[in-house]
Every structure is written in C-alpha cells, then in structure tokens.
Amino acid sequence: MRCPYCTGESAVIDTRELDNGETIRRRRRCKHCDRRFTTYERVESVNVMVVKKNGDREPYDREKLLRGLRVAAYKRPISADVIDTLVTEVEAALIAYDALEVPSSVIGEQVMERLRSLDEVAYIRFASVYRSFSDLGKLREAVEELMEKE
C-alpha cells in the first residue's frame, strides 16, 4: 500500500482484528519516509438500498452514517472506536433485516436505540436531525421521554 505522506511503498508492522473479526486494523510503516499510518479492512457486506422519507432511494453509505454520528457525538466522551462499533452493530441489524431495500426509519431507530444508552446528549442531537423537530415543543417532548425512561 502506498504511503499517504510520500506515496512510497509501506510494510505492515502490526495486524489486529476488531469488531469480533469483522474488521482488520493494520499499522504500516513507509519504507521511504519511515512514517507510520493505520489502515482498516472490512468486508463490504451491506448491499441494500435505503428508502428515504420522501421515497427516494440511495445505496447504503457507511461513511454517511459515521459522519452523522460524529456530528451528534461532537465534544462528547464517545471515542471513534465506539462510534465505529455502533455502526457495525447497525449494519448487522440491516443484514438481519434481510431485504434489498430498507426504510431510512429502520436505520434511524437502530441508531437511536443504541445512542440512547450510550450518551443522552448525542441521542438528542441525532434525534433532532433524524426526527426533524419543527419547534422547541417537539424537542422538549423528546427530552421528557428520555428522562421518563431513566
């Protein structure tokens, strides 16, 4: 693999399995500039179309889900590894759903179910975008619902 810093060839110096063997993490060292970097390998197993609320269809995009979760978890005590694991769990649920098309609501509910127990602030942030709260009253209802379940 080419070095992202100088485009020289690299060598693997460490390999580890993550996410119960679903992901392989490799530490690499460039043979030219001697800098180190990390790569990840994972099987692209989720091959479904997401049906949006407006009826549009688009291919499932892991990176899009990761971006949304990173925004929700911004400045919260949630590591990148935890977010990655959450997305892997959601993908496992999508595979179990066993359909060629999945409503975006299924993905959103899977994420919110996991975020609720992980971090309440990140949950509310994600829910505010996912559920498109139109006013403060709707947001208040979501917060009150969260507080009742404690």
From Swiss-Prot:
Cofactor or coenzyme needed: Zn(2+)
Cited Pfam families: ATP-cone (PF03477), Zn_ribbon_NrdR (PF22811)
GO molecular function, one term: DNA binding
Keyword Membrane attributed: no
UniProt entry keywords in alphabetical sequence: ATP-binding, DNA-binding, Metal-binding, Nucleotide-binding, Repressor, Transcription, Transcription regulation, Zinc, Zinc-finger
Domain ATP-cone: 48-138
Cofactor binding annotation: Binds 1 zinc ion.
BP-aspect Gene Ontology terms: negative regulation of DNA-templated transcription
PROSITE patterns to which the protein is assigned, alphabetical: ATP_CONE
Physiological role: Negatively regulates transcription of bacterial ribonucleotide reductase nrd genes and operons by binding to NrdR-boxes.
Family: Belongs to the NrdR family.
PANTHER family: TRANSCRIPTIONAL REPRESSOR NRDR
NCBIfam families, A to Z: transcriptional regulator NrdR
Protein name: Transcriptional repressor NrdR
